[in-house]
Design a protein with these regions (language model features):
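Patatin-like phospholipase
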Residues: 1-59, 69-239
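Gly/Ala-rich beta-loop-alpha elbow adjacent to hydrolase catalytic centers
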Residues: 60, 64
Length: 239
């Protein structure tokens, strides 16, 4: 069996690999963003502090997958941020090494029950039966399984790792390779990108922001960007 949990085939070549229904839930979608995922982390931190999110689920791909995981954390957000930035990123040049360090930090300090994983929907692009499919996962067995899915959702061959990455024995690639790697096959009313508050400063949480080319310009390079500064800038821009 290639997939686990409840399998729902929807339109747009999307397979939902989930444990729970989302039809009655509000959705926040979070885009890919490369290293600027740290900027989106600042946005998400502000959201958690200032908006009631208990009725929302979080659907993201690539950097958006990691931020969806953060949004599902039950408490102690400040500790989580501190653990992430206790990592020395000075000589870390690739997203793969960043992901490995973040995975280690999270697993060393948290357990599965510290997160509401049933609220997390991670978009991936899977190669199966000689074609690409968008696969959305929600049926995580534990925290490590969810993190491994985040890594798969962020995998770009030869950029974030080796040529292939397998998640649940399937060749898995960056969810950003899919047009709409989100739970209902479209952007939600709240769609977070690295340029979200730049475009919506006067209209918070209203309607989707269109993807901006700047969302992807720092995908492969962080040499001009301090990750902590990007996080702080995202938090400040959200105010």
């Amino acid at each position: 069996k290639l997939f686990h949990g409840t399998i729902i085939k929807s339109g747009k070549n999307i397979i939902l690999n989930i444990n729970s229904t989302f039809n009655e839930k509000k959705v926040i979608t979070i885009s890919p963003g490369g290293f600027r995922g740290f900027y989106m982390l600042g946005l998400c931190k502000y959201l958690k502090e200032n908006y009631e999110l208990k009725d929302y689920v979080f659907s993201g791909a690539s950097a958006g997958a990691w931020n969806s995981l953060f949004l599902s954390l039950k408490e102690n957000d400040d500790d989580f941020i501190n653990y992430i930035f206790d990592i020395d990123y000075t000589n870390v040049k690739s997203l793969q090494l960043i992901e490995e360090n973040v995975k280690k930090a999270v697993l060393n300090n948290y357990k599965t029950e510290d997160f509401k994983l049933d609220k997390v929907y991670i978009g991936t692009t899977v190669w199966k039966k000689f074609r690409f499919h968008t696969v959305i996962y929600n049926d995580f067995s534990d925290l490590e399984d969810a993190i491994n899915c985040c890594i798969g959702s962020s995998h770009i061959p030869f950029v974030t790792g080796n040529l292939f990455y397998k998640y649940r024995n399937l060749l898995t690639f960056d969810g950003g390779f899919s047009k709409y790697p989100y739970v209902d096959g479209k952007y939600a009313d709240v769609h977070i990108t690295p340029s979200y508050w730049e475009d919506r400063k006067k209209n918070k949480l209203s309607r989707p922001a269109n993807l901006n080319i700047k969302d992807y310009t720092t995908l492969f390079s962080k040499k001009e960007h301090d990750l902590k500064i990007m996080y702080l800038q995202g938090y400040e821009d959200a105010k």
